[in-house]
Amino acid sequence: MSIRIIPQDELGSSEKRTADMIPPLLFPRLKNVYNRRAERLRELAENNPLGDYLRFAALIAHAQEVVLYDHPLEMDLTARIKEANDQGKPPLDIHVLPRDKHWQKLLHSLIAELKPEMSGPALAVIENLEKASEQELEQMASALFASDFASVSSDKAPFIWAALSLYWAQMASLIPGKARAEYGEARQYCPVCGSMPVSSMVQIGTTQGLRYLHCNLCETEWHVVRVKCSNCEQSRDLHYWSLENEQAAVKAESCGDCGTYLKILYQEKDPKVEAVADDLASLVLDARMEQEGFARSSINPFLFPGEGE
C-alpha cells in the first residue's frame, strides 16, 4: 500500500475524517527539530566510543537550527501538489524536482556558522566546499540523490546533505495537502520526496503504538505497520536484535526474505529517542547486523558510504 498526497480541494469530507484517524503521513514541524537533535547527540556522546563524532554531528544540527530561522523559505506548492498527484509521483521527488539556488545559499550559511567551530581536517573540508563552484555543488547534490556515493567524498557528504535537507524540509513543511493511503507501490521510500528512511519509530502520544519511518532528507514521517519489513513488505522471517535486552529502546528489525534491516526506536522505552541521533549512536548494532549478513536499508544523514563500500 502506498501513500499519496492529495490537494485539499480534492478531498471529500469522509476522506478528511479518515485521514485524521490514523495519519498515514506526518509532515515535518520544524520548530526545535534540529535543536532537539543536537541536544540528543550531545547527550548520547557521553560514554560513547563515537562521542567525538556525535558531538561533531551536534554542531551541524545546531547550525541547521540557526540557518533555518535566518533563511526562511516562502513558496507556493499548490500547483506542484496537483501535478504530482496527477502523475502519481512524490510532490518533492528528488529525481525530478528542479533545485532552486536556495539550497546553496543554505550551504554557505551553514559553512559560515560552522567555521568558527571547526579545526583540522573538518575545517579544510568546509573551506573546500566554500570555494566550490555552483556547478560542482550541483554535481555533488545530483550524485548523492542518485546514490552515487563514490563521486562524493564521505567527509563532504554530510555538509551537502545538511543543506539539501534544510531546503527539502522547508518545502515539505509548506505542503498544502492531505495524505491518503492507497494500494500500489511499497512504502520503503518517503512519499514526499522519494528519499530513504533513516530509521523507524514506535511513537507515543496521539500516535501511540504506531510505527513511522523517518525520512533522512525532508524530515517527513510515514506510517508502516509493525511486524512487516519496511523494505520488501514480507513478515514471515522478521527478527529483532539489540545490544541490551528485550526492553531496549533501540533495536534492529531484520528480514530474512530481502536480507536487510532497519533500526526501530521505541518512545515508550525512552521518550527522548530521536530518529537520527539514536541511529547514529548505535553503530555498534550496525556492525553486529553486518556480521550476521544483513545489509542496511537506510542511510544516516551524518554517515554516508564511502568509495568502495
UniProtKB/Swiss-Prot annotation:
Cell compartments where the protein resides: Cytoplasm
SUPFAM superfamilies cross-referenced by the UniProt entry: FdhE-like (SSF144020)
GO molecular function annotation: ferric iron binding
GO CC annotations on file: cytosol
Segments crossing the lipid bilayer: none
Main location, first listed in the record: cytoplasm
InterPro entries in alphabetical order: FdhE-like_sf, FdhE_C, FdhE_central, FdhE_N, Formate_DH_accessory
GO biological process: protein maturation
Annotated keywords: Cytoplasm
Its biological purpose: Necessary for formate dehydrogenase activity.
Family: Belongs to the FdhE family.
Protein's name according to its UniProt entry: Protein FdhE
